[in-house]
């Protein structure tokens, strides 16, 4: 049966296919070309199989499709995620803005705070103690009013992060049910996204998940719809930690380095075959550039900062910047002003 490996970048999509007889085929096409096709990955598969755009993919002849994608990465770098509402314990509304109070430039008087991903924050009247016992009962009516207002204002994604909810998730579960009844498209709860102590890391990661999961889910659904005729084709996505997961389990918090992580695994395997055990990887795409290091074993981090955003999730140790082959360097008068990814 056919097998496909696809790297969907911000500018180009690369496809490697193996025919049933073992022959390897490769193809490359633009990730965005609305006049020619809806999705580059599906278009590439059809092109390799000599199908027309309107033809259905014979999924009974395809064993698996394994993908890495920078959809979430580029959405974060370019701040194109979904509008998000943050619900947090009363008294902690500014917690994620304050963060850990890190100041890279200690004596700089003009402090540049990182851009927040959430549009709005609501402090919820509720409180648990460190053992998970209720100190203050949840005010459900307050939450219902806040959620209705956010929904009416066009916000469709909600992040819920309460104090000590990793011990007792009852309050978060109640809020999640209310948000579900209000038909929010994405509901991220901290005790599921990052069930660990420390509200800053848990809250940051939950917001990232709520911000990116909708755009990621739309893309995954777009691909899976073309491959679900008889459900015989296995669709899997590369996670930031370098492992593959089923398409239905692919989350925003695990997708930030989906594409780059696949590059690290490929670099290491290629390097080993060539007899090298120490490697530095430089991966420049059209939208972003990734740099990584290997000295005998994969380097991973659990808490990291990407594009000015803190996140607590296992991922490959990769440094990413929003500057690629298609980036635009602006020039005014006698100085270069800024470099940004193309739109």
Report residues per predicted region.
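N-terminal glycine/serine-rich phosphate-binding loop of ATP-dependent small-molecule kinases
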Residues: 1-84, 129-131, 136-159, 172-190, ...
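Active-site phosphate-binding/coordination module
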Residues: 83-133, 190-194
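Glycine/threonine-rich beta-strand-loop-alpha-helix active-site module
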Residues: 97-101, 105-106, 278-281, 288-332
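A short acidic Gly-Thr/Ser loop motif
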Residues: 7-10, 69-70, 89, 260, ...
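N-terminal, positively charged, Ser/Thr/Ala/Gly-biased leader segments
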Residues: 188-203
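Conserved small/polar residues in nucleotide/adenosyl-binding loops
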Residues: 337-343
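Short beta-strand segments
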Residues: 68, 85-89, 123-125, 161, ...
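Glycine-rich phosphate-binding loops at beta-strand->alpha-helix junctions
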Residues: 161-171
């Amino acid at each position: 049966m056919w097998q496909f490996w696809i790297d969907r970048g911000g500018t180009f999509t690369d496809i490697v296919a193996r025919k049933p007889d073992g022959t390897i085929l490769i193809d490359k096409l633009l990730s965005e070309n609305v006049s020619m096709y809806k999705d580059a990955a599906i278009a590439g598969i059809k092109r390799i199989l000599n199908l027309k755009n309107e033809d259905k993919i014979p999924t009974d002849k395809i064993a698996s499709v394994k993908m890495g994608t920078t959809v979430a990465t580029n959405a974060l770098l370019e701040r194109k995620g979904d509008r998000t509402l943050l619900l947090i314990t009363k008294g902690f509304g500014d917690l994620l803005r304050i963060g850990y109070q890190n100041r890279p430039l200690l004596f700089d008087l003009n402090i540049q705070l990182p851009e927040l991903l959430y549009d709005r924050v609501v402090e919820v009247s509720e409180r648990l103690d460190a053992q998970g016992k209720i100190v203050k009962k949840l005010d459900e009516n307050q939450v219902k009013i806040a959620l209705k207002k956010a929904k009416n204002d066009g916000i469709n994604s909600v992040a819920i992060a309460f104090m000590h909810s990793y011990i007792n998730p009852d309050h978060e579960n109640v809020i999640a049910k209310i948000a579900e009844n209000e038909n929010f498209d994405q509901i991220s709860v901290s005790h599921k996204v990052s069930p660990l102590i420390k509200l800053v890391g848990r809250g940051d990661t939950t917001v990232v998940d709520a911000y990116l999961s909708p755009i990621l889910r739309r893309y995954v659904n777009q691909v899976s719809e073309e491959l679900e005729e008889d459900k015989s084709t296995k669709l899997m996505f590369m996670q930031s930690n370098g492992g593959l997961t089923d398409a239905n389990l692919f989350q925003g918090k695990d997708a930030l380095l989906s594409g780059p992580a696949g590059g690290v695994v490929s670099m290491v395997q290629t390097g080993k075959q060539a007899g090298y055990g120490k490697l530095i990887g430089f991966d420049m795409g059209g939208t972003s550039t990734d740099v990584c290091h290997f000295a005998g074993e994969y380097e991973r981090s659990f808490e990291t900062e990407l594009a000015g955003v803190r996140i607590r999730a296992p991922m490959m140790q990769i440094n990413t910047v929003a500057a690629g082959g298609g980036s635009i360097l602006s020039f005014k008068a006698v100085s270069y002003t800024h470099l940004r990814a193309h739109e």
